[in-house]
Design a protein with these regions (language model features):
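Short, structured coil segments at secondary-structure junctions
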Residues: 78, 143, 166-168
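Conserved mixed alpha/beta core segments that line enzyme active sites in large multi-domain catalysts
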Residues: 154, 270-272, 276-317, 373-771, ...
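Phosphate-binding/switch region of NTP-binding enzymes
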Residues: 152-207
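A conserved helix-loop-beta module that forms one wall/lid of the active-site cleft
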Residues: 283-344, 350, 356-359, 363-372, ...
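C-terminal regions of RecA-like/P-loop NTPase motor modules
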Residues: 2-10, 191-227
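Substrate-engagement module of ASCE P-loop NTPases
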Residues: 122-123, 128-154
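Conserved inter-motif catalytic segment of the P-loop NTP-binding fold
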Residues: 58-121
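Glycine-rich P-loop/Walker A and Walker A-like loops and their local beta1-loop-alpha1 context
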Residues: 13-67
Length: 858
């Protein structure tokens, strides 16, 4: 940074404490950052002692930023402000702490920092050392505070040194040759003398300039000029590779070091990594990382689940030919921070991290993240990655530090982007970089911000890594997709039949890309599979299998270079390279009817019922084994995203795409159900179709959406209803409220239900979806989707009420007789009280019993 860049120029000079050097250089200007390159830390101590003594004498406010775990660089701290910081807290926390210290000190302040090499060693990253300096140096310069830093010579890459040189005002080499101290200025900004850039010998308070060629040659011949400098991460990686042939104890020590670097020391999964990953595994993971830093929760979960299944005694033989190998890459968290720093977004990020700026600056930061540039060094690594995959489709997925961790699933909060990977190399690079930008920008979307805020994570250091995966599947004409995909849960909390074994687990199963399994899709249904009896159908599916089946398939269109949704018949018409009967068959009733009247049967709908897959293959057996072994090793229920592909003989390979702990509350103690005198004495009662364990919950308020009035609204007004529900949700925070409405809550299609975001119902104790079959409004049993993951994680009890079922009672008139108090609760907002009703229901309670599979509200 140049002095001319600063609006004001401080004229008072600051002494280095070495008079001869002050004379040559003209002293230090306020705002000068001085970086000393040293061989020995004692050489740095020599110039620090002189600087501190003189600054104290000149009544400067001397501040020492101490993060070295051993002795301080300053001996006498009696007149120095000591600030001890912990590097283990990470880049963001550490850097913010330094900036807060600087902010609180007087204008007459000077600073001494421990060697930046300790940052490099603590974070295993040249990149983050440079990032820290690039955001701290300009801040000190801006307020006019001089500061001393040091780095160990030949310990950084040339790229790192270049970034430090570019940022600092003064860069000095300091040498100790035969007991004499020499200073050699390499960069001194905004001043010049004919002898300034010669080496200078320090003799107490005096300076002798070395101008003789003979003396200079003799001096510099002592130094090691390396043509190639490896970063600290690369040095450690090379040590790890070398350790592969060494003794077991050395391998274990090096392996633990790599786990700490890539996973994190405090991660709960750290011990599991130690158990299931060998040093060779960790070296393989490290070799596929772009940049440095952590690889994030999603990457770790995928790797861990795969390792458990392939290495556990009870499953390794069974799955040796079933588990599809992965060849993923990881963009480390340091790249995320570098992207922020290099695009000038650090100050904005710091504003956004404050309470008052959390939402205020989010959109501006989101725009900045979406439109930044990557460094040439990182772009070169991106190109190597794309060359590796060729034109095979890949997916760029978020893998933040907190994501998919114990306690925080972040289900669907951050983006994932498919790269169909067609076009010229430059086009593919642009699409790939845009995908990463989109993931980075998604850290500032409203859902993610609210999620972190609601869980007390808004102050946590949320670093974003990227998981790059080859899309599982194959080419079928112009389309690319896996045969099947979905979500698997080891614990089936949503049961619709007393006979279902909850511990057997469940699947959400779709044909094609798994995007339809994790989202609440429009005009469509996925297959729900209870793994204790895979052919058992949920009630509504059993009633009309064709209607309540999957009608659309998500695919990658190679010609259009985009994600596309097509009808099932379009997807199955090409050669699937396996037997299409595994997944479904033509609608037989329609086919017979067409034949009777002589109509062409070629366009009869293909119904995805998966009957043969579930009855005649070992797929569900394999999935049950995966869920059992992974959940047992996690000692926790798990949620797994998977794909599977079949060959001509019907043999399959399963790909574990993602694994995370499934956030659940316990089933709770058995609840004594009230005895109902008759079916009209309750508000509702149902057998099955609820989720949330055994409960007895007080319901003080019911927010009810009138189906008859809702369906009459134009589309735009239906979206307004969703926003108004969000207003009521905020007002009822901390109160026992139940949300009741037609069809699917959270559908993006307002014709199927109220299109709320999860944050617009997150304060409810209970969510109830009501079927009105005469209006084509039906609940969707989407347990396993991101939406339902949010329900489970937040502890919201769920119930679906199906009309025209003998074991379901819903006395809607009991509500309609009550006064609508919505205008009393929300006085300032414009609420449509014809559609939205709020009832005071104090005294009402919900009871549920898992064993009997009964839920009652009375």
């Amino acid at each position: 940074m140049k002095y001319s860049d600063r609006g004001d120029v401080f004229m008072d000079k600051i002494s280095t404490g070495i008079k001869g050097f002050d004379d040559i250089m003209g002293g230090l200007y306020p705002g000068d950052n001085v970086v000393w390159q040293v061989e020995d830390i004692n050489n740095y101590k020599h110039v620090v002692d002189a600087f501190v003594r003189k600054s104290i004498k000149d009544e400067k406010n001397v501040n020492y930023i101490h993060f070295r775990k051993v002795n301080s660089i300053i001996d006498d701290l009696s007149k120095v402000n000591l600030f001890e910081l912990d590097l283990a807290k990470g880049f963001e926390d550490f850097t913010m702490s330094v900036h807060n210290i600087i902010k609180t000190q007087s204008e007459n302040a000077v600073y001494v920092f421990d060697s930046l090499t300790y940052i490099q060693r603590g974070w295993y990253s040249d990149l983050m050392t440079a990032n820290f300096f690039k955001v701290t140096c300009p801040y000190l310069y801006k307020i006019g505070a001089a500061a001393y830093f040091s780095i160990k010579r030949n310990s950084y890459t040339y790229d790192t040194i270049a970034k430090i040189r570019e940022t600092t005002q003064i860069l000095m080499d300091i040498y100790n040759v035969d007991g004499s101290i020499y200073i050699h200025p390499l960069k001194v900004e905004n001043r010049y003398t004919p002898i300034l850039f010669f080496p200078h010998k320090i003799e107490e308070d005096k300076i002798t300039t070395i101008t003789s060629s003979g003396e200079a040659s003799k001096l510099f011949s002592h130094f090691d000029w390396r043509n190639k400098r490896l970063g600290y991460w690369r040095i450690n990686f090379n040590k790890a590779k070398a350790a592969l042939t060494q003794d077991e104890s050395t391998q274990e020590r090096i392996k633990q070091n790599l786990i700490d670097i890539l996973v994190g020391k405090d991660s709960k999964i750290n011990e599991m990594c130690k158990q299931y990953f060998t040093l060779a595994d960790m070296v393989q993971i490290a070799s596929r990382e772009i940049g440095t830093g952590f690889i994030g929760g999603k990457s770790i979960g995928m790797l861990m689940a795969t390792a458990i299944v392939s290495k556990s005694e009870e499953t390794k033989e069974y799955f040796k030919d079933i588990l599809e190998p992965h060849d993923s890459f990881y963009v480390g968290t340091d790249v995320f921070y570098s992207y922020i720093v290099e695009n000038g977004l650090w100050d904005l990020r710091m504003k956004q991290k404050t309470d008052e700026g959390y939402f205020k600056y989010a959109k501006e930061l989101q725009d900045g993240l979406q439109n930044g540039k990557f460094s040439e060094m990182i772009e070169e690594q991106f190109m190597h990655l794309l060359e590796y995959y060729g034109q095979c489709p890949i997916i760029v997925r978020s893998s933040s530090l907190l994501e998919d961790n114990f306690g925080n699933a972040f289900a669907g909060k951050y983006d994932s982007v498919f790269c169909i990977n067609q076009g010229t190399p430059s086009q593919r690079l642009k699409a790939f970089e845009d995908a990463i930008r989109t993931v980075y920008a998604s850290t500032m979307n409203e859902d993610a911000l609210n999620y972190r805020k609601n869980r007390g994570l808004d102050k946590r250091d949320e670093q974003m890594a990227i998981l790059v995966q080859r899309v599982s599947g194959d080419y079928y004409g112009e389309y690319y997709f896996p045969h099947i995909a979905g979500v698997a849960n080891s614990s089936n909390l949503y049961v619709w039949n007393k006979k279902i074994d909850m511990d057997a687990g469940m699947l959400r199963l779709v044909f094609g890309l798994g995007t339809r399994a994790v989202d609440r899709v429009n005009n469509d249904y996925v297959r729900i599979v209870a793994l204790d009896d895979p052919t058992r159908l949920p009630a509504m599916t059993k009633k009309d299998p064709q209607r309540f089946s999957q009608h659309y398939v998500d695919v990658l269109n190679l010609n259009k270079n985009e994600l596309e949704t097509i009808i099932v018949n379009e997807a199955v018409k090409s050669n699937l390279k396996t037997q299409s009967s595994l997944f479904g068959s033509k609608d037989k009733e329609t086919e017979e009817r067409f034949k009777r009247v002589g109509i062409d049967t070629s366009n009869i709908p293909f119904v995805l019922n998966f009957e043969r897959l579930l009855r005649s293959t070992k797929f569900t057996e394999a999935m049950r084994k995966i869920l059992k072994v992974v959940s047992s090793k996690y000692n926790y229920p798990v949620d797994i995203e998977y794909t599977a592909n079949f060959d001509k003989q019907g043999n399959f390979r399963i790909n574990i795409v993602q694994c995370r702990p499934l956030q659940t509350r316990g089933l709770g103690k058995t609840v004594e159900l009230p005895k109902l005198e008759d079916k009209n004495s309750c508000l509702f009662s149902s057998t099955g179709n609820f989720m949330g364990g055994n409960v007895r919950l007080a319901i003080d308020y019911i927010v009810f959406i009138s189906s008859d009035d809702y369906v009459k609204l134009p589309e735009v007004e239906k979206y307004n209803i969703a926003r108004q529900v969000g207003i009521i949700n905020k007002e009822l925070k901390g109160k026992n409220a139940m949300l009741m409405g037609p069809g699917r809550w959270g559908s993006s299609n307002p014709e199927l239900g109220v299109p709320v975001k999860f944050t617009e119902l997150c304060n409810m104790s209970v969510m109830c979806e009501i079927a009105y079959s005469n209006q084509d409004l039906m609940p969707e049993l989407s347990y396993g989707s991101h939406f339902f993951q949010d329900l489970v994680e937040t502890g919201i009890f769920y119930v679906a009420l199906f009309d025209n079922k003998e074991d379901v009672v819903f006395n809607e008139n009991k509500l309609r007789k009550k006064e609508n108090i919505v205008k009393q609760i929300i006085k300032d907002a414009n609420i449509n009280d014809e559609v939205i009703k709020v009832y005071d229901t104090k005294g009402l309670q919900i009871y549920s019993d898992i064993t009997q599979q009964i839920v009652t509200c009375s």
